[in-house]
């Protein structure tokens, strides 16, 4: 039960005091700070601030925007450039494993046979099995050494080349040269400054023929990777613009419907008020108790 108390202008509801806007501030806080604080009430607070406008989707025309598009896809899938980098890394790892493993297995088998001339086996099957086991160990040992090195080299090369191509939005042989220089320098960095310079020079020399080969294969396909990516990006931008226009149209239609409904409601309310005012007054209700 709520009771109004005029002395302190407070509303007491079940033992809880609810201060009115005209109440004074707490004495403890005023005594602590030494000055009065401005009062803020719920009725004075503004509604949630909404954005003034919904920005129109912009075409990613800068290098960093295109770089960010490599790692962001509306469909939640990886872009084709990243998939190509991963595929090339896996393929180079397999090639490196085969390239280093086969000679390593042959060398390990021959060395095992040479070192096991004085060893006695129970039968020929045990001797052949031991030689095969040595060849397998050699294949895995030497194949792994070549596999991760070739995979790292190719992955770093393709990563730098893809980054430069996407950032500048064009295919150029200089990108392959720079990629080869960076990759060769990194792989020869443990040899010091001379190794860094020699690796950079070798990378530049090998980057040009690799670029000519890759660009030639892409041109034979009728469409380069950059042209395909540019076309897909343009189509995606047009799709976003179309979706944005559709949402904007729906918003305008909704605002128009709300305005029309509000106008109709106000007219109905005004008509009801006019009808009430036009009705005759009740004579019995107009007479007071003292007029009887």
From Swiss-Prot:
It holds the Pfam family Tim17. GO terms for cellular component: mitochondrial membrane; mitochondrion. InterPro entries: TIMMDC1. The chain crosses the membrane at residues 146-168, 195-215. Its main location: mitochondrion. Keywords: Chaperone, Membrane, Mitochondrion, Transmembrane, Transmembrane helix. GO terms for biological process: mitochondrial respiratory chain complex I assembly. It is found in: Mitochondrion membrane. The keyword Chaperone applies. It is a multi-pass membrane protein. Associates with the intermediate 315 kDa subcomplex of incompletely assembled complex I. Belongs to the Tim17/Tim22/Tim23 family. Chaperone protein involved in the assembly of the mitochondrial NADH:ubiquinone oxidoreductase complex (complex I). Participates in constructing the membrane arm of complex I. This is Complex I assembly factor TIMMDC1, mitochondrial.
């Amino acid at each position: 039960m709520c009771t109004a108390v005029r002395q302190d202008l407070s509303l007491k509801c079940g033992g809880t005091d609810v201060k009115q806007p005209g109440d004074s501030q707490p004495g403890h806080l005023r005594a602590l700070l030494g000055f009065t604080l401005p009062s803020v009430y719920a009725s004075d607070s503004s509604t949630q601030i909404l954005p003034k406008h919904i920005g129109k989707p912009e075409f990613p025309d800068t290098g960093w925007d295109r770089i960010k598009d490599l790692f962001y896809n509306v469909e939640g899938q990886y872009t084709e450039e990243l998939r190509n980098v991963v595929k090339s890394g896996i393929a180079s790892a397999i090639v490196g494993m085969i390239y280093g493993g086969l000679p390593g297995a042959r060398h390990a088998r021959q060395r095992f046979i040479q070192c096991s001339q004085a060893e006695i086996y129970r039968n020929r099957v045990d001797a052949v099995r031991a030689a095969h086991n040595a060849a397998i160990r050699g294949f895995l040992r030497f194949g792994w050494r070549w596999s991760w090195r070739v995979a790292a080299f190719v992955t770093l090369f393709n990563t730098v080349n893809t980054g430069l191509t996407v950032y500048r939005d064009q295919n150029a042989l200089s990108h392959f040269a720079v990629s080869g220089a960076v990759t060769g320098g990194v792989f020869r960095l443990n040899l010091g400054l001379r190794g860094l310079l020699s690796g950079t020079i070798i990378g530049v020399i090998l980057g040009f023929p690799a670029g000519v080969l890759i660009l030639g294969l892409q041109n034979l396909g009728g469409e380069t990777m950059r042209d395909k990516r540019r076309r897909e990006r343009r189509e995606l931008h047009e799709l976003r613009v179309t979706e944005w226009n559709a949402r904007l149209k729906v918003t305008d239609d909704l605002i128009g419907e709300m305005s029309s409904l509000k106008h109709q409601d106000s007219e109905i309310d005004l008509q009801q008020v006019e009808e009430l005012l036009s009705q005759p007054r009740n004579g019995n209700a107009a007479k007071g108790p003292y007029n009887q």
